Amino acid sequence: MSEQFHLGVVHDGDIATAVIHGDLDADTVPRLRAAVSGLLSNGTMHITLDLKEMTFVDSSGLGAIVDTARSLRAAGGDLSLVNPRPSVRRIFQLTSLDDALRTAAGEQA
């Protein structure tokens, strides 16, 4: 069972920061996809996913993050990932997604 998932979004100009709370897995990915779809349809081109409260990510969650990055790049935007927990960072490293996605240990400057 997934840890209670919720997503908080804060806008700062043309950048949206989405803080993921809980597990990003097959049960919760549709909620992330819906939120990203809403941001894209509103013209948001730069999204930062703050992972400090994300407790777990499975393959469907990784796929959703990769799909988000591809969609934004195709539209001329970008995706940044910040503050992953060590266990989540390790998953990105094991899957080589840390090289494919822009990931930062701390808040972006």
Regions found by a protein language model. Name each.
Residues 1-56, 67-109:
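STAS-like cytosolic regulatory interaction modules
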